[in-house]
């Protein structure tokens, strides 16, 4: 790979569904993939690539959010970022939607507790960057908004075709809801979450700041 590209310009974002190998592999249906993924990320880091660990918060893993953060913090060098992300409900069978549903209130306690752990480590010298995307601001207290992506932030601009000079614009599938969020005091700065979440769960999804 090093002969073909400048690895230092690579930014690799890989999803780990859990810090528990069996739970990660239950999601991606690939036995042994957890340790292979971790080893692969470490190898790419040693080669000079920028590494980021993505963790989609689900009903299955929300209770282990602090554990996941601590695992990554102990396992990877400090300049490996950690990204928490809401989930897109597209592709989930309708009969399974209710089982998968998480409101902003459902994740608030665990998210804030994990942020507290992170901020305490920062206070004691840690250089790691942890942040959250595609999660409404009502999922945490205002104090933690510095760790949340805001409307002014551009997370993904589009897709660059490696075989041409074309840049394909990415369809914006994350937003706040005009119907359910308009009265919220954070409406103008909140990035919101996946539109599918609002489509399926409506006002149950959020708790606006009024």
Where are these regions (language model features)?
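Short clusters of hydrophobic/aromatic residues that line enzyme substrate/ligand-binding pockets
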Residues: 24-28, 100-102, 190, 206
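Radical SAM/AdoMet-radical enzyme domain recognition
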Residues: 1-85
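Flexible glycine/acidic-rich beta-alpha junction loops that bind and position SAM and/or redox cofactors
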Residues: 60, 80-105, 128-150
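A broadly conserved sequence feature marking short terminus-proximal activation segments
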Residues: 108-168
């Amino acid at each position: 790979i090093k002969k073909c590209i400048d690895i230092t310009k690579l930014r690799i974002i890989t999803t780990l569904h859990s810090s528990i190998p069996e739970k990660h592999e239950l999601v991606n249906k690939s036995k042994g993939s957890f340790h292979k993924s971790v080893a692969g990320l470490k190898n790419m880091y040693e080669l000079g690539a920028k590494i980021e660990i993505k963790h989609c918060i689900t009903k299955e893993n929300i209770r282990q959010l602090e554990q996941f953060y601590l695992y990554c913090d102990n396992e990877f060098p400090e300049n490996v970022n950690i990204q928490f992300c809401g989930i897109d409900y597209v592709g989930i069978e309708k009969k399974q939607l209710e089982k998968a549903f998480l409101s902003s209130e459902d994740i608030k306690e665990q998210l804030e507790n994990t942020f507290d752990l992170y901020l305490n480590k920062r206070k004691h010298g840690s250089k790691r960057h942890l942040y959250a995307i595609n999660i409404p601001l009502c999922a945490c207290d205002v104090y933690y908004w510095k760790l949340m992506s805001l409307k002014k932030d551009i997370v993904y601009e589009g897709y660059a075709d490696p075989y041409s000079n074309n840049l394909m614009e990415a369809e914006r599938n994350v937003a706040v809801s005009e119907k359910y969020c308009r009265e919220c005091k954070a409406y103008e700065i909140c990035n919101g979450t996946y539109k599918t979440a609002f489509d399926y769960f409506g006002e149950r999804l959020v708790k606006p700041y009024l």
